[in-house]
Amino acid sequence: MYESVDVNPFLMMDYYNQSRGCLIPDKMPHPFSSSIRHQHWSGSNHSIETQSTSSEEIVPSPPSPPPPPRIYKPCFVCQDKSSGYHYGVSACEGCKGFFRRSIQKNMVYTCHREKNCIINKVTRNRCQYCRLQKCLEVGMSKESVRNDRNKKKKEEKKPECTENYTLSPDTEQMIDRVRKAHQETFPSLCQLGKYTTSNSSERRVALDVDLWDKFSELSTKCIIKTVEFAKQLPGFTTLTIADQITLLKAACLDILILRICTRYTPEQDTMTFSDGLTLNRTQMHNAGFGPLTDLVFAFANQLLPLEMDDAETGLLSAICLLCGDRQDLEQADKVDVLQEPLLEALKIYVRNRRPHKPHMFPKMLMKITDLRSISAKGAERVITLKMEIPGSMPPLIQEMLENSEGLESSSGAQGSRASATTPGSCSPSLSPNSAQSSPPTQSP
Protein backbone atom coordinates (compact mmCIF):
# COMPACT_ATOMS: atom_id res chain seq x y z
CA MET A 1 0.00 0.00 0.00
CA TYR A 2 1.22 3.43 -0.83
CA GLU A 3 0.40 6.85 0.54
CA SER A 4 1.17 10.23 -0.94
CA VAL A 5 1.81 13.65 0.56
CA ASP A 6 1.22 16.82 -1.39
CA VAL A 7 4.15 19.10 -0.50
CA ASN A 8 3.70 21.47 -3.42
CA PRO A 9 1.44 21.59 -6.45
CA PHE A 10 3.84 19.63 -8.69
CA LEU A 11 6.06 17.48 -6.47
CA MET A 12 4.77 14.12 -5.24
CA MET A 13 6.74 12.00 -2.73
CA ASP A 14 5.94 8.33 -2.25
CA TYR A 15 7.06 6.01 0.44
CA TYR A 16 6.58 2.38 1.16
CA ASN A 17 4.27 1.95 4.09
CA GLN A 18 5.95 -1.14 5.57
CA SER A 19 9.68 -0.25 5.33
CA ARG A 20 9.34 3.37 6.45
CA GLY A 21 12.37 4.26 4.39
CA CYS A 22 13.69 7.69 3.63
CA LEU A 23 11.65 9.95 1.48
CA ILE A 24 13.28 10.03 -1.96
CA PRO A 25 12.02 12.24 -4.75
CA ASP A 26 10.61 10.20 -7.58
CA LYS A 27 11.98 12.66 -10.05
CA MET A 28 13.87 15.88 -9.59
CA PRO A 29 12.01 18.92 -10.83
CA HIS A 30 13.17 20.48 -14.05
CA PRO A 31 14.94 23.82 -13.52
CA PHE A 32 12.78 25.48 -16.21
CA SER A 33 9.54 24.75 -14.40
CA SER A 34 10.71 25.82 -10.95
CA SER A 35 9.83 29.49 -11.45
CA ILE A 36 6.38 28.66 -12.81
CA ARG A 37 5.74 26.24 -9.99
CA HIS A 38 6.95 28.79 -7.46
CA GLN A 39 4.62 31.43 -8.86
CA HIS A 40 1.70 29.03 -8.85
CA TRP A 41 2.42 27.93 -5.31
CA SER A 42 2.82 31.50 -4.13
CA GLY A 43 -0.42 32.47 -5.85
CA SER A 44 -2.18 29.54 -4.26
CA ASN A 45 -0.92 30.52 -0.81
CA HIS A 46 -1.98 34.13 -1.41
CA SER A 47 -5.43 33.01 -2.43
CA ILE A 48 -5.84 30.92 0.70
CA GLU A 49 -4.65 33.75 2.93
CA THR A 50 -7.04 36.18 1.24
CA GLN A 51 -10.02 33.91 1.76
CA SER A 52 -9.07 33.31 5.37
CA THR A 53 -8.66 36.99 6.08
CA SER A 54 -11.93 37.96 4.41
CA SER A 55 -13.87 35.36 6.38
CA GLU A 56 -12.48 36.69 9.67
CA GLU A 57 -13.54 40.26 8.86
CA ILE A 58 -17.28 39.44 8.46
CA VAL A 59 -18.51 40.98 11.73
CA PRO A 60 -21.73 42.94 12.37
CA SER A 61 -21.35 46.68 11.98
CA PRO A 62 -22.17 48.88 14.99
CA PRO A 63 -25.66 50.46 14.97
CA SER A 64 -25.83 53.89 13.45
CA PRO A 65 -26.50 56.73 15.89
CA PRO A 66 -30.07 58.12 15.96
CA PRO A 67 -30.65 61.18 13.83
CA PRO A 68 -30.47 64.46 15.72
CA PRO A 69 -33.85 65.98 16.62
CA ARG A 70 -35.23 68.48 14.16
CA ILE A 71 -34.80 72.03 15.32
CA TYR A 72 -37.18 74.57 13.83
CA LYS A 73 -36.79 78.29 13.70
CA PRO A 74 -38.77 80.19 16.35
CA CYS A 75 -42.41 80.97 15.58
CA PHE A 76 -42.48 83.62 12.85
CA VAL A 77 -45.43 85.32 14.54
CA CYS A 78 -44.58 85.51 18.26
CA GLN A 79 -41.03 84.07 18.49
CA ASP A 80 -42.20 81.29 20.83
CA LYS A 81 -40.84 77.74 20.44
CA SER A 82 -41.99 76.33 17.11
CA SER A 83 -43.66 72.93 16.79
CA GLY A 84 -43.07 72.67 13.04
CA TYR A 85 -44.18 74.22 9.76
CA HIS A 86 -47.87 75.06 9.74
CA TYR A 87 -49.71 76.69 6.85
CA GLY A 88 -46.41 77.54 5.17
CA VAL A 89 -44.30 78.97 7.99
CA SER A 90 -42.60 77.89 11.19
CA ALA A 91 -45.15 78.44 13.95
CA CYS A 92 -45.99 77.48 17.52
CA GLU A 93 -49.12 75.53 18.45
CA GLY A 94 -50.81 78.66 19.78
CA CYS A 95 -50.44 80.72 16.61
CA LYS A 96 -51.27 77.73 14.43
CA GLY A 97 -54.56 77.19 16.26
CA PHE A 98 -55.37 80.91 16.35
CA PHE A 99 -54.85 81.28 12.60
CA ARG A 100 -56.87 78.15 11.80
CA ARG A 101 -59.84 79.23 13.93
CA SER A 102 -59.75 82.77 12.58
CA ILE A 103 -59.87 81.62 8.95
CA GLN A 104 -62.35 78.78 9.40
CA LYS A 105 -64.82 80.95 11.33
CA ASN A 106 -64.21 84.08 9.21
CA MET A 107 -63.48 86.06 12.36
CA VAL A 108 -63.44 89.86 12.17
CA TYR A 109 -61.26 91.47 14.84
CA THR A 110 -60.83 95.09 15.92
CA CYS A 111 -57.68 96.79 17.17
CA HIS A 112 -58.31 99.23 20.01
CA ARG A 113 -55.04 101.06 19.39
CA GLU A 114 -53.35 102.08 16.12
CA LYS A 115 -53.18 98.67 14.37
CA ASN A 116 -49.46 98.36 15.03
CA CYS A 117 -49.38 96.37 18.27
CA ILE A 118 -46.22 94.43 19.05
CA ILE A 119 -46.86 90.69 18.85
CA ASN A 120 -44.58 88.43 20.86
CA LYS A 121 -44.86 85.52 23.27
CA VAL A 122 -46.14 87.77 26.06
CA THR A 123 -48.44 90.14 24.14
CA ARG A 124 -49.86 87.82 21.47
CA ASN A 125 -53.23 87.43 23.23
CA ARG A 126 -53.79 91.15 23.78
CA CYS A 127 -54.76 92.13 20.23
CA GLN A 128 -56.29 89.53 17.95
CA TYR A 129 -56.46 91.93 15.01
CA CYS A 130 -52.71 92.62 14.96
CA ARG A 131 -51.92 88.97 15.63
CA LEU A 132 -53.93 87.87 12.59
CA GLN A 133 -52.32 90.57 10.45
CA LYS A 134 -48.87 89.39 11.47
CA CYS A 135 -49.83 85.79 10.65
CA LEU A 136 -50.66 86.94 7.13
CA GLU A 137 -47.56 89.14 6.87
CA VAL A 138 -45.15 86.32 7.70
CA GLY A 139 -46.74 84.13 5.03
CA MET A 140 -49.43 81.95 6.62
CA SER A 141 -51.70 80.68 3.85
CA LYS A 142 -55.48 80.99 4.05
CA GLU A 143 -55.78 78.45 1.25
CA SER A 144 -53.91 75.84 3.29
CA VAL A 145 -56.49 76.18 6.06
CA ARG A 146 -59.37 75.80 3.59
CA ASN A 147 -57.77 72.75 1.97
CA ASP A 148 -57.24 71.21 5.39
CA ARG A 149 -60.89 71.82 6.27
CA ASN A 150 -62.14 70.34 3.00
CA LYS A 151 -59.96 67.28 3.56
CA LYS A 152 -61.52 66.73 6.99
CA LYS A 153 -65.01 67.08 5.52
CA LYS A 154 -64.25 64.38 2.96
CA GLU A 155 -62.98 62.10 5.71
CA GLU A 156 -66.20 62.64 7.67
CA LYS A 157 -68.27 61.65 4.66
CA LYS A 158 -66.59 58.26 4.43
CA PRO A 159 -68.99 55.56 5.57
CA GLU A 160 -68.13 54.29 9.01
CA CYS A 161 -68.09 50.62 9.81
CA THR A 162 -69.99 50.85 13.09
CA GLU A 163 -71.88 48.47 15.25
CA ASN A 164 -75.62 48.19 15.01
CA TYR A 165 -76.99 50.22 17.91
CA THR A 166 -80.67 49.38 17.97
CA LEU A 167 -82.86 49.98 21.00
CA SER A 168 -84.66 46.82 22.03
CA PRO A 169 -88.15 47.21 23.54
CA ASP A 170 -86.81 46.36 27.00
CA THR A 171 -83.97 48.88 26.73
CA GLU A 172 -86.31 51.58 25.46
CA GLN A 173 -88.67 50.89 28.34
CA MET A 174 -85.80 51.18 30.83
CA ILE A 175 -84.66 54.50 29.36
CA ASP A 176 -88.21 55.88 29.57
CA ARG A 177 -88.48 54.74 33.17
CA VAL A 178 -85.21 56.40 34.20
CA ARG A 179 -86.05 59.59 32.29
CA LYS A 180 -89.42 59.80 34.01
CA ALA A 181 -87.85 59.22 37.43
CA HIS A 182 -85.37 62.02 36.79
CA GLN A 183 -87.97 64.49 35.52
CA GLU A 184 -90.35 63.82 38.42
CA THR A 185 -87.66 64.51 41.00
CA PHE A 186 -85.76 67.28 39.22
CA PRO A 187 -87.58 69.90 37.09
CA SER A 188 -85.65 71.32 34.16
CA LEU A 189 -84.35 74.87 33.99
CA CYS A 190 -87.00 75.97 31.49
CA GLN A 191 -89.77 74.99 33.95
CA LEU A 192 -88.52 77.30 36.68
CA GLY A 193 -89.26 80.94 37.38
CA LYS A 194 -85.89 82.40 38.24
CA TYR A 195 -85.41 84.87 41.06
CA THR A 196 -82.32 86.29 42.69
CA THR A 197 -81.44 87.78 46.04
CA SER A 198 -79.83 91.17 46.55
CA ASN A 199 -79.34 90.84 50.29
CA SER A 200 -75.96 89.17 49.97
CA SER A 201 -72.42 90.45 49.88
CA GLU A 202 -70.87 91.25 46.51
CA ARG A 203 -67.53 89.85 47.60
CA ARG A 204 -66.52 86.47 48.93
CA VAL A 205 -66.90 86.00 52.67
CA ALA A 206 -66.48 82.98 54.93
CA LEU A 207 -70.24 82.40 55.21
CA ASP A 208 -73.43 84.36 54.56
CA VAL A 209 -75.82 83.07 57.23
CA ASP A 210 -78.99 84.02 55.36
CA LEU A 211 -77.80 82.30 52.18
CA TRP A 212 -76.70 79.27 54.19
CA ASP A 213 -80.14 78.92 55.80
CA LYS A 214 -81.79 78.96 52.38
CA PHE A 215 -79.22 76.65 50.84
CA SER A 216 -79.40 74.08 53.65
CA GLU A 217 -83.18 74.02 53.40
CA LEU A 218 -83.03 73.33 49.65
CA SER A 219 -80.28 70.73 50.09
CA THR A 220 -82.36 68.77 52.57
CA LYS A 221 -85.25 68.64 50.11
CA CYS A 222 -82.87 67.61 47.34
CA ILE A 223 -81.59 64.66 49.36
CA ILE A 224 -85.15 63.44 49.84
CA LYS A 225 -85.76 63.77 46.09
CA THR A 226 -82.61 61.76 45.41
CA VAL A 227 -83.98 58.95 47.55
CA GLU A 228 -87.26 59.09 45.62
CA PHE A 229 -85.32 58.92 42.35
CA ALA A 230 -83.38 55.87 43.55
CA LYS A 231 -86.56 54.03 44.52
CA GLN A 232 -87.84 54.25 40.94
CA LEU A 233 -84.72 52.72 39.38
CA PRO A 234 -85.09 49.13 38.11
CA GLY A 235 -84.07 46.66 40.80
CA PHE A 236 -82.96 49.16 43.45
CA THR A 237 -85.63 48.20 45.98
CA THR A 238 -84.75 44.50 45.58
CA LEU A 239 -81.43 45.17 47.34
CA THR A 240 -81.13 44.85 51.09
CA ILE A 241 -82.01 47.97 53.08
CA ALA A 242 -78.41 48.15 54.27
CA ASP A 243 -77.09 48.17 50.69
CA GLN A 244 -79.66 50.76 49.61
CA ILE A 245 -78.50 53.11 52.36
CA THR A 246 -74.83 52.42 51.61
CA LEU A 247 -75.32 53.29 47.94
CA LEU A 248 -77.34 56.42 48.73
CA LYS A 249 -74.74 57.74 51.16
CA ALA A 250 -71.89 57.04 48.75
CA ALA A 251 -73.51 58.57 45.66
CA CYS A 252 -75.82 61.28 47.01
CA LEU A 253 -73.31 64.11 46.68
CA ASP A 254 -72.33 62.89 43.19
CA ILE A 255 -75.96 63.17 42.08
CA LEU A 256 -76.53 66.54 43.79
CA ILE A 257 -73.52 68.07 42.04
CA LEU A 258 -74.43 66.56 38.66
CA ARG A 259 -77.97 67.88 38.93
CA ILE A 260 -77.13 71.44 39.97
CA CYS A 261 -74.47 71.65 37.25
CA THR A 262 -77.07 70.90 34.57
CA ARG A 263 -78.78 74.14 35.66
CA TYR A 264 -75.71 76.24 34.96
CA THR A 265 -76.15 79.38 32.81
CA PRO A 266 -72.74 80.30 31.34
CA GLU A 267 -73.78 83.75 30.10
CA GLN A 268 -74.52 84.93 33.65
CA ASP A 269 -72.23 82.41 35.39
CA THR A 270 -75.12 81.37 37.65
CA MET A 271 -76.79 78.22 38.94
CA THR A 272 -80.50 77.81 39.60
CA PHE A 273 -82.16 75.74 42.32
CA SER A 274 -85.52 74.00 42.02
CA ASP A 275 -87.49 76.79 43.66
CA GLY A 276 -86.04 79.22 41.09
CA LEU A 277 -83.39 80.75 43.35
CA THR A 278 -80.50 81.77 41.11
CA LEU A 279 -77.07 82.41 42.61
CA ASN A 280 -73.89 83.67 41.00
CA ARG A 281 -70.43 82.32 41.76
CA THR A 282 -69.79 84.64 44.70
CA GLN A 283 -73.17 83.89 46.25
CA MET A 284 -72.62 80.15 45.88
CA HIS A 285 -69.31 80.53 47.68
CA ASN A 286 -70.91 82.51 50.51
CA ALA A 287 -73.87 80.11 50.78
CA GLY A 288 -71.58 77.36 52.00
CA PHE A 289 -69.73 75.96 48.98
CA GLY A 290 -66.57 77.83 49.99
CA PRO A 291 -63.43 76.39 48.35
CA LEU A 292 -65.61 73.89 46.51
CA THR A 293 -67.18 76.66 44.40
CA ASP A 294 -64.66 76.93 41.58
CA LEU A 295 -64.44 73.13 41.23
CA VAL A 296 -68.21 72.86 40.80
CA PHE A 297 -68.37 75.70 38.27
CA ALA A 298 -65.47 74.21 36.31
CA PHE A 299 -67.28 70.87 36.18
CA ALA A 300 -70.45 72.63 34.98
CA ASN A 301 -68.47 74.18 32.12
CA GLN A 302 -67.13 70.74 31.18
CA LEU A 303 -70.68 69.40 30.93
CA LEU A 304 -71.78 72.04 28.42
CA PRO A 305 -70.17 70.46 25.29
CA LEU A 306 -71.85 67.12 26.10
CA GLU A 307 -75.33 68.68 25.70
CA MET A 308 -76.91 66.00 27.88
CA ASP A 309 -80.69 65.62 27.91
CA ASP A 310 -82.89 64.33 30.75
CA ALA A 311 -82.50 60.67 29.73
CA GLU A 312 -78.70 60.89 29.71
CA THR A 313 -78.55 62.81 33.00
CA GLY A 314 -80.90 60.29 34.61
CA LEU A 315 -78.96 57.29 33.31
CA LEU A 316 -75.63 58.76 34.41
CA SER A 317 -77.10 59.45 37.87
CA ALA A 318 -78.36 55.86 38.06
CA ILE A 319 -74.94 54.51 37.04
CA CYS A 320 -73.32 56.64 39.78
CA LEU A 321 -75.75 55.19 42.31
CA LEU A 322 -75.71 51.51 41.33
CA CYS A 323 -71.97 50.99 41.54
CA GLY A 324 -70.69 47.70 42.94
CA ASP A 325 -67.28 49.04 44.01
CA ARG A 326 -68.68 50.95 46.99
CA GLN A 327 -67.36 49.93 50.37
CA ASP A 328 -69.31 47.74 52.82
CA LEU A 329 -71.81 46.37 50.30
CA GLU A 330 -73.40 43.06 51.21
CA GLN A 331 -74.33 42.13 47.63
CA ALA A 332 -71.79 43.89 45.41
CA ASP A 333 -72.27 41.37 42.59
CA LYS A 334 -76.00 42.03 42.51
CA VAL A 335 -75.39 45.77 42.30
CA ASP A 336 -73.09 45.20 39.30
CA VAL A 337 -75.79 43.14 37.62
CA LEU A 338 -78.25 46.03 38.04
CA GLN A 339 -75.72 48.50 36.62
CA GLU A 340 -74.90 46.57 33.43
CA PRO A 341 -78.19 47.23 31.55
CA LEU A 342 -77.97 50.91 32.52
CA LEU A 343 -74.50 51.16 30.97
CA GLU A 344 -75.70 49.41 27.82
CA ALA A 345 -78.78 51.64 27.61
CA LEU A 346 -76.69 54.81 27.93
CA LYS A 347 -74.23 53.61 25.28
CA ILE A 348 -76.94 52.79 22.75
CA TYR A 349 -78.93 55.96 23.48
CA VAL A 350 -75.88 58.23 23.15
CA ARG A 351 -74.74 56.55 19.89
CA ASN A 352 -78.21 56.84 18.38
CA ARG A 353 -78.50 60.48 19.40
CA ARG A 354 -75.00 61.35 18.15
CA PRO A 355 -74.10 58.90 15.35
CA HIS A 356 -71.06 60.94 14.27
CA LYS A 357 -69.58 61.30 17.77
CA PRO A 358 -68.48 57.80 18.84
CA HIS A 359 -66.39 59.10 21.75
CA MET A 360 -69.25 60.85 23.53
CA PHE A 361 -70.23 57.80 25.60
CA PRO A 362 -66.77 57.27 27.18
CA LYS A 363 -66.54 61.03 27.80
CA MET A 364 -69.75 60.87 29.82
CA LEU A 365 -68.49 57.94 31.86
CA MET A 366 -65.29 59.84 32.64
CA LYS A 367 -67.42 62.46 34.37
CA ILE A 368 -68.19 59.92 37.09
CA THR A 369 -64.52 60.02 38.08
CA ASP A 370 -64.62 63.83 38.22
CA LEU A 371 -67.78 63.71 40.32
CA ARG A 372 -66.21 61.37 42.84
CA SER A 373 -63.21 63.65 43.20
CA ILE A 374 -65.41 66.70 43.84
CA SER A 375 -67.65 64.72 46.21
CA ALA A 376 -64.70 63.71 48.37
CA LYS A 377 -63.81 67.38 48.82
CA GLY A 378 -67.50 68.17 49.37
CA ALA A 379 -67.72 65.73 52.25
CA GLU A 380 -64.72 67.43 53.84
CA ARG A 381 -66.46 70.76 53.35
CA VAL A 382 -69.49 69.53 55.32
CA ILE A 383 -67.23 68.89 58.31
CA THR A 384 -65.60 72.34 58.18
CA LEU A 385 -69.02 73.96 57.77
CA LYS A 386 -70.06 72.66 61.17
CA MET A 387 -67.44 74.93 62.71
CA GLU A 388 -68.58 77.96 60.67
CA ILE A 389 -72.37 77.89 60.93
CA PRO A 390 -73.95 79.49 64.01
CA GLY A 391 -76.31 76.60 64.80
CA SER A 392 -76.28 72.88 64.26
CA MET A 393 -75.99 71.14 60.93
CA PRO A 394 -79.33 69.89 59.55
CA PRO A 395 -79.37 66.20 60.54
CA LEU A 396 -80.12 64.81 57.09
CA ILE A 397 -77.25 66.74 55.49
CA GLN A 398 -74.83 65.64 58.19
CA GLU A 399 -75.96 62.03 58.06
CA MET A 400 -75.98 61.72 54.28
CA LEU A 401 -73.01 63.82 53.22
CA GLU A 402 -70.55 63.72 56.08
CA ASN A 403 -70.20 59.95 55.81
CA SER A 404 -69.53 59.95 52.07
CA GLU A 405 -67.27 57.16 50.91
CA GLY A 406 -63.54 57.75 51.16
CA LEU A 407 -63.74 60.42 53.87
CA GLU A 408 -61.92 59.80 57.10
CA SER A 409 -64.00 60.94 60.07
CA SER A 410 -62.61 63.60 62.34
CA SER A 411 -61.22 62.68 65.70
CA GLY A 412 -62.99 63.19 69.03
CA ALA A 413 -66.71 63.85 69.13
CA GLN A 414 -66.99 64.14 65.37
CA GLY A 415 -65.42 60.72 64.96
CA SER A 416 -67.82 59.13 67.42
CA ARG A 417 -70.84 60.64 65.71
CA ALA A 418 -69.61 59.48 62.32
CA SER A 419 -69.08 55.95 63.51
CA ALA A 420 -72.47 55.83 65.19
CA THR A 421 -74.19 55.57 61.82
CA THR A 422 -72.52 52.85 59.80
CA PRO A 423 -73.07 52.56 56.03
CA GLY A 424 -75.29 49.60 56.57
CA SER A 425 -77.46 50.97 59.33
CA CYS A 426 -81.15 51.59 58.76
CA SER A 427 -81.45 55.25 59.64
CA PRO A 428 -85.07 56.46 59.62
CA SER A 429 -84.16 59.65 57.77
CA LEU A 430 -82.26 57.80 55.07
CA SER A 431 -84.42 54.72 54.75
CA PRO A 432 -85.94 54.43 51.27
CA ASN A 433 -89.15 53.29 52.94
CA SER A 434 -89.38 56.49 54.94
CA ALA A 435 -88.77 58.54 51.80
CA GLN A 436 -91.75 56.87 50.22
CA SER A 437 -94.09 58.35 52.80
CA SER A 438 -92.50 61.79 52.82
CA PRO A 439 -94.52 64.69 51.41
CA PRO A 440 -93.69 66.01 47.93
CA THR A 441 -90.76 68.39 47.99
CA GLN A 442 -88.66 70.40 45.60
CA SER A 443 -84.98 69.65 45.10
CA PRO A 444 -82.31 72.26 44.51
Swiss-Prot record:
Residues 35-67, 402-444 are annotated as: Disordered. Residues 35-46 have a biased composition (Polar residues). GO terms for biological process: cell differentiation; hindbrain morphogenesis; liver development; negative regulation of transcription by RNA polymerase II; positive regulation of transcription by RNA polymerase II; response to retinoic acid; retinoic acid receptor signaling pathway. The keyword NADP does not apply. Its main location: nucleus. Residues 1-71 are annotated as: Modulating. Belongs to the nuclear hormone receptor family. NR1 subfamily. Composed of three domains: a modulating N-terminal domain, a DNA-binding domain and a C-terminal ligand-binding domain. The 9aaTAD motif is a transactivation domain present in a large number of yeast and animal transcription factors. Heterodimer; with an rxr molecule. Binds DNA preferentially as a rar/rxr heterodimer. This is Retinoic acid receptor alpha-A.
